[in-house]
């Protein structure tokens, strides 16, 4: 099936080189926020299938703690849109032994969107595999060969991957993998456009960015008569979040630089959480939170 060629996210996790300097003091990756019709069932799924644990965000909100970041859930009345038409493609965990990890998932009843697939040729790394899980509310979750089994990456799509990557470097202190300046030349794998691309690091999370042109080839039905991304808000993966030690300063710096602020600073959970929202490249919703992610 076409999406079985959508794999370079796995390769990027191991094939990264040197990094470019940060342009601003770094933020920290804070969370992935999902919409779901059944938060309790979703939490059961993630904590039983992957290396993560139940925890209460701010001591009050049931969620999933995955090493250094949160997975948070909003309950919605009907199934959230899950077609790959926004700039958030998927997120995923690593596996030291992909064959064993895949079989364990199969034996436990996990449904797969894409079965175990060998992409050693692409990765130039013998025994390199990936698979896509059909998660709660049809969230797409990748398992891929890695040197760990933690929550490891978020894979995005962009009309300009290089510019998008530079935006995350500038505003969130993400570190770009690669020795040479990023290439803007198109690159293809088995007919699918996978470049230009960017691979960035924010704490434990590898942020990988592929070109928008990948999506219509991999998901033609969803992209029929479509030219642009849907906003991520309201979809199964609603947004991602980054934290700053001083949210007010960070938000004002971004605002002065022309970043669109979509929600001003608010507080929640008896003022224990301070947050705001901005719009990032390709209509991605990004939450800014004060204070680094931690398990209560």
Please place each PLM-identified region on the residue numbering.
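Sec-exported extracytoplasmic/periplasmic mature domains
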Residues: 47-51, 96-97, 103-110, 169, ...
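Core segments of cupin and vicinal oxygen chelate
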Residues: 24, 30-71, 76, 121-127, ...
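Bacterial N-terminal signal peptides
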Residues: 8-18
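N-terminal secretory signal peptides that target proteins for export/translocation
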Residues: 1-6
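Vicinal oxygen chelate
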Residues: 27-37, 62-65, 80-157, 178-201, 242, ...
């Amino acid at each position: 099936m076409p999406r079985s060629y959508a794999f370079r996210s796995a390769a990027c996790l191991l094939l990264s080189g040197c990094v470019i300097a940060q342009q601003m003091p770094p933020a920290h990756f804070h969370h992935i926020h999902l919409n779901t019709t059944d938060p309790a069932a979703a939490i059961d799924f993630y904590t039983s299938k992957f290396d993560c644990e139940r925890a209460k965000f701010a001591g009050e909100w049931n969620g999933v703690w995955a090493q250094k970041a949160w997975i948070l859930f909003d309950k919605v009345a009907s199934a959230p849109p899950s077609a790959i038409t926004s700039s958030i493609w998927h997120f995923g965990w690593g596996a030291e032994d992909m064959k064993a990890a895949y079989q364990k998932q199969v034996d436990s009843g996990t449904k797969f969107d894409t079965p175990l697939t060998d992409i050693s040729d692409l990765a130039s790394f013998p025994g390199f595999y990936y698979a896509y899980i059909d998660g709660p509310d049809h969230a797409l979750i990748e398992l891929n060969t890695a040197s760990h089994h933690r929550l490891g990456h978020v894979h995005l799509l962009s009309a300009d991957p290089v510019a998008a990557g530079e935006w995350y470097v500038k505003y969130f202190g993400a570190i770009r993998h690669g020795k040479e300046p990023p290439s803007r030349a198109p690159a293809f794998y088995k007919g699918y456009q996978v470049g230009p691309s960017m691979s960035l690091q924010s704490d434990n999370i590898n942020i990988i960015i592929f070109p928008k042109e990948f999506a219509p080839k991999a998901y033609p039905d969803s992209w029929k008569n479509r030219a642009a991304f849907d906003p991520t808000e309201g979809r199964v993966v609603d947004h991602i979040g980054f934290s700053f030690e001083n949210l007010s300063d960070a938000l004002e710096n971004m605002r002065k630089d022309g970043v669109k602020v979509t929600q001003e600073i608010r507080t929640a959970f008896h003022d224990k959480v301070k947050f705001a929202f901005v719009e990032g490249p390709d209509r991605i919703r990004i939450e800014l939170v004060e204070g680094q992610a931690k398990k209560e």
